[in-house]
């Protein structure tokens, strides 16, 4: 069954996600599980200051660390918050939720982690690979549930997906590079050169580049790389590749995702399809991907936190992989902008999700 999502091309406002009633960032005419009417859990510690609400400090504490404010991660936290409500948690009444955002600066992570250690959180949620790696220092005393860690083994946070021996487990947003590139080769049949932009400081992006190179070597493709250290480098990196490549591919790099509109404009102006690693990046104007629903990722993260608060050990919970829950997301407005036709075989597939920009 085809789904259609209408989406804006702007990043969620973080404070909107923390409000008591959060409107959905997308409108779906056929969502997998229906629209949730649950309000988000309000954080007792917003990123810019402490809440004035008086709470019982003896309540269980959930510390949440988010790396940066961008669509993918905001979807995860929004879904996480709503699922906590569905599970019976209400901030300030039977739980305390402490949310911190590193504002895209990894140098902020040690300070946040140390503050959570001092405050004795009962469980910490680490959203993204860099955050999970920074939170490893907590695991001697505090269970950690990570979310959106692309390759937990390579990141060093678990020995393997079923052997939880480092004090943390969670959910992975592993990018299926092969399936995304298969989609690219189906739609962009004449493509020979792929432009890949990434931050080499993000292990998730490095591992995805390795997978892309492996695919390229067996399919006769050439990879043109451009590395960036911050989102301000994205414009020049994308522009430098635009004349050299037939298509762009960016995985789930947080530095890129933070400034997706910049990359989208360069790609669209050059009429080059931009294949991406997350559904949310298609919502931000990217052309297409094959991947998971990040809402599911946030919900499952909340369920794992619930299990920890009820006494289950993280060692008893394997990493959750969404390998069978993949959808093909295509922004049909972007397709029109760059003049690309989508094969009927894709449009009629029950796993096809059409993304349209909200007018």
Write out the residue ranges for each language-model feature:
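C-terminal motif of bacterial Sec signal peptides marking the signal peptidase cleavage site
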Residues: 17-20
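An alpha-beta-alpha
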Residues: 62, 80, 169-216, 318-334
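Hydrophobic alpha-helical segments within soluble ligand-binding/sensing domains
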Residues: 152-193, 292-312
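Hinge/cleft segment of the Venus flytrap/periplasmic-binding protein
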Residues: 310-359
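Structural motif
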Residues: 96-118, 227-241
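Beta-alpha junction/loop-to-helix N-cap segments that form part of ligand/metal-binding clefts
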Residues: 102-159, 253-268, 272, 277
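Bacterial signal peptide processing site
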Residues: 22-24
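Extracytoplasmic "Venus flytrap"
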Residues: 50, 56-57, 61-87, 98-107, ...
């Amino acid at each position: 069954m085809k789904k259609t999502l209408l989406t804006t091309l702007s990043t969620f406002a973080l404070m909107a996600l923390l409000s008591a009633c959060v409107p959905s960032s997308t409108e779906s005419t056929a969502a997998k599980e229906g629209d949730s009417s649950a309000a988000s859990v309000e954080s007792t510690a917003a990123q810019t200051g402490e809440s004035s609400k008086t709470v019982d400090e003896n309540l269980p504490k959930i510390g949440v660390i988010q790396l940066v404010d961008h669509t993918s991660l905001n979807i995860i936290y929004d879904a996480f918050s709503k699922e906590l409500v569905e599970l019976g948690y209400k901030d300030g009444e039977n739980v305390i939720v402490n949310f911190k955002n590193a504002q895209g600066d990894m140098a902020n992570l040690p300070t946040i982690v140390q503050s959570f250690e001092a405050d004795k959180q009962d469980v910490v949620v680490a959203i993204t690979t860099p955050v999970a790696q920074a939170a490893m220092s907590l695991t001697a005393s505090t269970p950690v549930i990570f979310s959106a860690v692309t390759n937990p083994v390579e990141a060093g946070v678990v020995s393997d997906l079923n052997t939880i021996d480092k004090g943390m487990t969670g959910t992975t947003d592993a990018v299926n590079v092969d399936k995304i590139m298969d989609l690219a080769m189906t739609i962009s049949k004449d493509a020979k050169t792929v432009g890949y932009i990434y931050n080499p400081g993000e292990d998730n992006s490095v591992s995805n580049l390795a997978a892309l190179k492996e695919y390229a070597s067996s399919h006769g493709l050439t990879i043109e790389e451009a590395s960036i250290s911050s989102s301000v480098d994205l414009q020049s990196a994308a522009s430098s590749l635009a004349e050299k490549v037939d298509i762009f591919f960016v995985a789930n790099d947080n530095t890129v995702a933070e400034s997706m509109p910049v990359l989208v404009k360069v790609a669209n102006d050059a009429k080059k399809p931009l294949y991406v690693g997350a559904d949310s990046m298609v919502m931000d104007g990217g052309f297409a991907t094959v991947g998971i629903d990040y809402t599911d990722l946030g919900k499952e993260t909340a369920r794992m936190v619930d299990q920890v608060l009820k006494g289950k050990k993280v060692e008893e919970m394997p990493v959750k992989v969404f390998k069978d829950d993949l959808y093909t997301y295509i922004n049909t407005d972007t397709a029109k902008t760059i003049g690309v036709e989508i094969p009927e075989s894709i449009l009629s597939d029950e796993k096809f999700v059409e993304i349209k920009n909200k007018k």
